[in-house]
A protein has these predicted regions:
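N-terminal segments that mediate ammonia production and transfer
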Residues: 2-136, 144-184
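A short, hydrophobic C-terminal helix/tail in secreted or cell-surface proteins
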Residues: 188-189
Length: 189
């Protein structure tokens, strides 16, 4: 419906039917996977691979897909002009896992390219390029490759601390980062 606004990828499921929808601008990803005769929906292609499934395709911006025992149906009545579509850059540089593919773009490759572009636009005189785990590591590798500055590790991420930038207060974000990241000490190449 045109009443549904904003950025979304949603899935509704019952014992007999599963429905997936993606916002008309394509801001949030949603993809279709299949294993044997079972379809499933996921926000990232890596989730499909993790359960032994085969990536079928991305749900297109503005598309609603439905699955029953009779197969898949597609409704594109909410689709808009592709020139008006947009992607959320945060999906490629932060949210998505590096082993995902979103709208035919390999996330790992996108981060390498972003790091190389950053090195071209903002060269620096430095001894070492380091990234902030996890999403910044690959971009740092791209920066290193383009600039010729060695790449190394300087931080360890506490895997048990969730996303820090979404905390409601700056003081909470700052204290969460202190718990989340530890210096390795002397950075090594």
């Amino acid at each position: 419906s045109s009443d549904l606004q904003g950025a979304y990828a949603l899935v509704v499921s019952s014992p007999r039917k599963m429905i997936g929808a993606r916002d008309p601008f394509g801001l949030k990803p949603l993809c279709i996977g299949k294993r044997d005769n079972t379809y499933f929906l996921a926000s990232e292609s890596c989730a499909i691979a993790a359960v032994g499934g085969e990536f079928v395709r991305d749900v297109e911006p503005g598309e609603i897909v439905s699955f029953t025992k009779h197969g898949m149906k597609s409704d594109k009545t909410m689709a808009i002009d592709p020139n008006k579509q947009a992607r959320c850059i945060f999906e490629y540089i932060y949210f998505a896992r590096m082993d995902s593919v979103i709208d035919d773009v390999n996330v790992y490759h996108a981060r390498i390219v972003a790091g190389k572009a950053l090195a071209e636009s903002y060269p620096v005189d430095a001894d070492l390029v380091v990234g902030v785990p996890d999403s910044g590591l690959v971009a740092a590798k791209g920066y290193s490759e383009q600039s010729g500055i060695p790449y190394g590790m300087a931080f360890h991420k506490n895997s048990y601390v969730g996303r820090t930038f979404i905390k409601p207060k700056q003081s909470q974000r700052e204290s969460s980062v202190k718990i989340k990241l530890n210096e390795i000490g002397r950075a090594h190449v």
